[in-house]
Swiss-Prot record:
Belongs to the binding-protein-dependent transport system permease family. FecCD subfamily. The keyword Signal does not apply. It comes from Shigella flexneri. The complex is composed of two ATP-binding proteins (BtuD), two transmembrane proteins (BtuC) and a solute-binding protein (BtuF). The chain crosses the membrane at residues 13-35, 55-77, 90-107, 111-133, 146-168, 188-205, 242-264, 274-296, 303-322. GO terms for biological process: cobalamin transport. This is Vitamin B12 import system permease protein BtuC. It is a multi-pass membrane protein. The lineage of its organism: Bacteria, Pseudomonadati, Pseudomonadota, Gammaproteobacteria, Enterobacterales. It holds the Pfam family FecCD.
Length: 326
């Protein structure tokens, strides 16, 4: 038994090391790649200072943090709701952030600065989160709380559809670009949004013990003495914050929160002491690679990153499911 535990521990360490190397390689490639390839030796030239440090670095950091936040949010949702199909958009938080952003675009007639749009997206996500916490205080079961989140998401989706239908052509272009996701407008002015993600990410990565108990199921977690009401509220609030900030930075990006935790579990990373940091590393790496593809796929335009993540990731996910089912 001890030998098996040591083997599993060594395997977990190897996985984390491999994911760390992958993330570093993706980060370096993201800084080098673009319309002009700039190798690390040219980063401190005048051209490198402009393209790498002023344009590519803030975008790369935003992609890294958003990928980590979405993947960790997916892992938290899947443990909390005991559902492998749970993901950040399931509770309606992503759509809530979208409603806040769309309201800001329409009411501000496209004239609001980026920081104001970001605050409105966060406010929309937090409003949905507060509604969910109100349901949670009524001691609803996990399944009913999940259904409440799905219903809120449907309502927010309907509101976004109505807003797009009545918007002008200029607003519609901006809204459609947001709904497909993208990091094209990210620069150092959004650094406050990036900083807002870091403490919550670090805190959740340190909560492996309650997450492992939640993964056993609600009944087992209660029997082990876990205060379900407290942890449900805290985790829903933390997820709402991360998703709201991510939407404010990049718009709606699917797939990462659903598939990354599931893929890592299929690879044997079930302990949240390893799964949570693994999700952060894998989510950051996957979104960095998707962002590179989005930038380089077309010569004169940039693909929406949400389309890239779904196109590249869905076949891999299906292959892993078929492989695990053999």
């Amino acid at each position: 038994m001890l030998t098996l535990a040591r083997q599993q521990q060594r395997q977990n360490i190897r996985w984390l090391l491999c994911l760390s190397v992958l993330m570093l390689l993706a980060l370096l490639l993201s800084l080098c790649a673009g319309e002009q390839w700039i190798s690390p030796g040219d980063w401190f030239t005048p051209r490198g200072e402009l393209f790498v440090w002023q344009i590519r670095l803030p975008r790369t950091l935003a992609v890294l943090l958003v990928g980590a936040a979405l993947a960790i949010s997916g892992a938290v949702m899947q443990a909390l709701f005991e559902n492998p199909l749970a993901e950040p958009g399931l509770l309606g938080v992503s759509n809530g952030a979208g409603v806040g952003l769309i309201a800001a675009v329409l009411l501000g007639q496209g004239q609001l600065p980026n920081w104001a749009l970001g605050l409105c997206a966060i406010a929309g996500a937090l409003i949905i989160t507060l509604i969910l916490l109100r349901f949670a205080r009524r001691h609803l079961s996990t399944s009913r709380l999940l259904l409440a989140g799905v219903a809120l998401g449907i309502i927010c989706s309907a509101l976004m559809t109505w807003a797009i239908y009545f918007s002008t052509s200029v607003d519609l272009r901006q809204l459609m670009y947001w709904m497909m996701g993208g990091f094209g407008g990210v620069d150092w002015r959004q650094s406050w949004l990036m900083l807002a993600l870091i403490p919550v990410l670090l805190w959740i990565c340190c909560q492996s013990r309650p997450m492992n108990m939640l993964a056993l199921g609600e009944i087992s977690a209660r029997q082990l003495g876990l205060p379900m009401w407290f942890w449900r509220n805290v985790l829903v609030a933390a997820t709402g914050w991360m998703v709201g900030v991510s939407v404010a930075l990049a718009g709606a990006i699917g797939f990462i929160g659903l598939v990354i935790p599931h893929i890592l579990r299929l690879c044997g990373l079930t302990d949240h002491r390893v799964l949570l940091p693994g999700c952060a590393l894998a989510g950051a790496s996957a979104l960095l690679l998707a962002d590179i593809v989005a930038r380089l796929a077309l010569a004169a335009a940039e693909l929406p990153i949400g389309v890239v993540t779904a196109t590249l990731g869905a076949p891999v996910f299906i292959w892993l499911l078929l492989k695990a089912g053999r």
